[in-house]
Structures are given as C-alpha cells and as structure tokens.
Regions:
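Mid-to-C-terminal Rossmann-like scaffold of FAD/NAD(P)H-dependent oxidoreductases
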Residues: 1, 21, 283-396, 427, ...
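Beta1-alpha1 glycine-rich phosphate/pyrophosphate-binding loop at the start
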Residues: 1-73, 165-188, 327, 400, ...
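Short hydrophobic core segments
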Residues: 5-6, 80, 102-112, 155, ...
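Rossmann-like dinucleotide-binding cores of NAD(P)H-dependent redox enzymes
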Residues: 59, 151-152, 159-216, 299-303, ...
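Glycine-rich dinucleotide-binding loop and its adjacent helix/turn
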Residues: 109-171, 206, 266-268, 487-492, ...
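FAD-site-proximal beta/loop scaffold in flavoenzymes
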Residues: 124-148, 224-226, 232-309, 404, ...
C-alpha cells in the first residue's frame, strides 16, 4: 500500500512512525512544504525569549534521521498544491517552482492551521510578525537580536500571545497586550481570567482589553498601533496572535466536505467525505464529547492521539476517535493557568444548564514550606453532578489537578468521582484533603442544597441595602477593600458573635 501524508509536524510525523511500526511493507511518503518536520511547536516562544538557548533542541527529529529510522520517504520543501481524487494523485510544487505528480492508495491531510492576519492598513509594516512555525521564529529571533525591543505590543491574549508577552518581557521590553475581548485566555471564565489580569499588571504588563486595532503606521523605526477608538501606542515589535483557522485550502479545492465550524469534516474514524482520504490535527473539526456540536481543537496532544489512531485505520482498522475536550495549560510568568472541558460561558452558549463551585485551596499542606494558593472552578450538572469542566489558576500543582479533572470528564464522571479519587499524599505534595476532593465536596453541598452560592455576577442584580452582607475575612484583609455595606466578622469569631447576625 502506498500512503501519502501531507504535513510533517505533530500528527503527520506520528502517523508515519506508527504506520511503519505496524507494517514494514507499506510505502510511506511524507510531504512537507517547510524545511522541517517533527519540531517542538509549543517551545518556539521560549527560544525567542532565550529560555531555550539552543535552536537544535527545538527539533525532535531531523528529516534525514526520521527517514532513516522509520524508512519513510521524507520530502521537505515539497508543497502539495492539488489533490486529484479521481486519479488518486497529488500535484507537488518544489522550491524551484517545478511540479510533479505522485499517486496514492490512501492519503492523509495534516495541514494544520494558519495564523489569522486581518487585512488592516499597514499590517505589512516592518516589525510586525506572526508566530506559527520555525521560519516565523527565525525571523523574530533575528529581529530582536538585531534591534532589542524597548516596547513590544502583543495583539491577542491567547496562549501564544501570553507566552510571547512573557518572553519579550524577559528580553527587557515593556510589553502591552491588546485584546478585543474583555479578558485574556478565552478558554476560561472571566472570574478566573481576572486573577491572570492582576498577575500580568503586577509584572508591569499593560493591558488594553476591549480594544480593537484599526490600523498600523510606520513611525520611523517604530510601529504605531492605532485603535478603533483613536488611541494609539508605539512599539519596536508587534506580535499578531489573533488566532488561527484550519488550513483547508487543499481540501476545499478537492471538494471534500467542510463542516459548519470551518474545519475538514471527518467521521468517527477520521475519514473525510472521500473514503481514501483521512484528515487529522488542527485542520479538522469533530463533535465535542459534551455538547455533541462540531468544534475546532488546536492542541498538540489530540493531534498526536489522532495520528496514532488514523495510522491503524489507514491500514484497515476501524478504531473510533473519542474526541477531545480541550485540556490545556500555560505558564504566565510565575502563574500557571489550565482548563479542561467546558467553562460556564460555553455551557451557557450551548444552552446547557449548569452549576459551578469555586474553591481556593493551597497546593500542599499549609504547614509545610512554600504552600501556594490556587483557585479551582468546576462546572457540573446541578441534578446529576456530571462534571462538565474545570479551570485552575495557581502557582504549583496546577498541572496534576487539571489532569485529574480531565480524566474524570473524559470518562463521563461526576463530582462524586472527584471525592473518591485516591491521590498520593505527603505534606510536600498535597493535603490530606486534596484540592480536587475539596472541589467535589463543595459541589456536593451545592447539589444537596446545603449551601446556596451567590456568584459575583449576581451582585449586580442585588440591592445590597436589602441584604446582610457578611465578610468573614480578617480585619487586615477587610481593610484592603470590601463591598459597600459589608459587615466584618472574622470567621473564627462567628460562633461568639452569632447574635450579631440577623435571624
């Protein structure tokens, strides 16, 4: 069997390796339009910021080494420009602009996603970059080495945007983040993003939220970023991190079905509308395990998982892909931000009734040195307790807790399962009541009606003069600021001062 794979990063390379491990006779051709395959895409911002000092460490495998190890015909700088489904051939363009045709028995599309670059006036000004691949990285790296930036503007506050903000800050730049929405990091709810906002400002990052860019202007060696409200800021370098969209050019030209979310439509076996053509990675859409609606998921973990599954299916298996729930994590200066499943805002958009709990445990036993605070928000079905999503913002131990929440959600578990998870415990690592268990306990109290939560958004609709607002923080904490009309009775004094509470 002759299998052609279009795209050699993440899913494409994984697929090729898996096919070879399963079948020594298959002819495998890997076509990649860039110079590199199998590189650490997620590590690119850290190379720019000198956290990763050696460029070579970004490459998991060179094309030559990969080809030898797995006996794969790796062809870099070979861009597929057309798929002829009737002839079962692809047309490939070389760096020289010459073209050739290659036939296939089975074809895999792993073309990834392309950065959004809106047609704004001045967007081609010197000093404006996107970051998606090694070539982009090399351009940015050369630019900042040649002209160390004093002021940097990052447009877009997703994962890459915040990682670039941190790394440009590490290079000594005064960083400003411009975001059209009212918060950074869209996968989490506003209440959790507010913690990230505070941390960014503590680090000296300027936040311009709910600001849309109208244009760019060259101002000598600087770039002027002009907002739609007329305000403007200057920068030595601008990073566009507005988002990405599925790279479906080839699929559209081949008249493969494109789904309602804009990705290549695939069935449960990652097969497109052509039975000989499969697709994986950022280019595809699939049904969300919770909502059942098509969605796009731009994460390396699911792409590699899809690569393993599709390799077997290309060889004749029928292994279904279970979908992905978007488990993600990012380092934002000293803070770790993670999410899995669906936040409240997306559940609301999907018309799914939910409840939520927010808890603020420590990363490990408080009496052991260096215990750090974390905030955990979970969303769940208010009747059955089925877990829908989790978000964690903290400094230590965030990664293992988000993975526990992800595992429960993937197995369609409930908040009661959070209470039953048996975590390893020792004071340096956790508490006897682990933060995940505490989140489950509080959610159970909400479901059973033992507590009735009032969420921060509810305060906008409450006449505070008509309620007794009790603030149980310490006097020093209360002095830092409180809601109008709040009465301060520290938690440890409530029993002795119970008479002061209204009946």
């Amino acid at each position: 069997m002759k299998i052609i794979i279009i795209g050699g990063v993440a899913g494409g390379a994984t697929t090729a390796a898996r096919i070879r491990r399963s079948d020594e006779t298959a002819e495998i051709i890997l076509l990649e339009k860039g110079k590199y395959i199998s590189y650490a895409n997620c590590g690119l911002p850290y190379y720019i910021g000198d956290v990763i000092e050696e460029r070579e460490k970004l490459f998991v495998q060179t094309p030559e080494a990969f080809g030898v190890r797995f006996r794969v015909d790796v062809r870099t700088e070979n861009e597929v420009i057309f798929i002829d489904r009737k002839k079962k051939t692809v047309t490939v363009r070389l760096k020289s602009e010459d073209t050739y045709e290659e036939s296939y028995d089975k074809l895999l599309i792993s073309t990834g996603a392309s950065p959004v670059r809106p047609p704004l006036p001045g967007i081609d000004s010197t000093g404006i970059f996107t970051l998606r691949n090694v070539a982009d990285t090399d351009r940015i790296k050369a630019y900042v080495n040649n002209r160390p930036p004093r002021r940097a503007v990052v447009i877009g506050a997703g994962f890459i945007g915040l990682e670039m903000a941190e790394n440009l800050h590490a290079l000594g730049a005064q960083v400003s983040i411009v975001e059209m929405g009212n918060q950074v990091m869209a996968p989490i709810d506003f209440s959790m993003a507010a913690l990230v906002h505070q941390h960014l400002m503590e680090k000296g990052v300027n936040l311009y939220l709910e600001q849309a860019v109208a244009s760019f202007e060259q101002a000598g060696k600087e770039v002027k970023v002009v907002f739609k409200n007329g305000q403007s800021i200057l920068a030595d370098i601008v990073i566009l991190s507005i988002g990405v969209r599925p790279e479906t050019t080839l699929a559209r030209a081949a008249e493969l079905t494109i789904g309602e979310a804009g990705g290549i439509a695939v069935n449960d076996y990652l097969q497109t509308s052509d039975e000989s053509i499969y697709a994986i990675g950022d280019a595809i859409e699939f049904r969300h395990p919770i909502t059942g609606k098509p969605w796009l998921n731009y994460l390396a973990g699911p792409a590699n998982r899809q690569g393993r599954i599709v390799a077997d299916n290309l060889l004749g298996a029928q292994i279904p892909y279970e979908g992905a729930i978007g488990t993600s994590i990012a380092k934002v200066f000293d803070m770790t931000v993670a999410s899995t499943g669906l936040p409240g805002k997306r559940l609301k958009q999907a018309g799914i009734v939910y409840a939520s709990s927010t808890t603020h445990p420590a990363s490990h036993a408080g009496y052991y040195p260096d215990a750090m605070p974390m905030s955990i928000k979970i969303t769940f079905d208010p009747q059955t307790g089925k877990l829908y999503g989790g978000q964690i913002v903290g400094y230590d131990g965030v990664d293992k807790r988000i993975d526990e929440l992800s595992l429960v959600i993937k197995h369609e578990g409930t908040i009661y399962d959070l209470m039953k998870v048996e975590q390893a415990y020792a004071p340096p690592f956790s508490s006897a009541k682990d933060p995940v268990a505490i989140a489950g306990y509080v959610a159970e109290n909400i479901i059973l009606g033992r507590v009735k939560p009032v969420y921060w958004r509810d305060l906008r609709d409450i006449e505070l003069k008509d309620v007794f607002l009790l603030d149980v923080r310490t006097p020093d904490e209360f002095a830092l600021g409180s809601l109008p009309g709040a009465v301060n009775i520290p938690l440890d004094e409530i029993r002795d001062r119970i008479a002061e509470l209204p009946s």
